[in-house]
Swiss-Prot record:
It catalyses: D-glyceraldehyde 3-phosphate + phosphate + NADP(+) = (2R)-3-phospho-glyceroyl phosphate + NADPH + H(+). Keywords: NADP, Oxidoreductase. The keyword Membrane does not apply. This is Glyceraldehyde-3-phosphate dehydrogenase B. Tetramer of either four A chains (GAPDH 2) or two A and two B chains (GAPDH 1).
Amino acid sequence: AVSLVLPQLK
């Protein structure tokens, strides 16, 4: 789940 959010912020 977290892996999906971090790339979106980048």
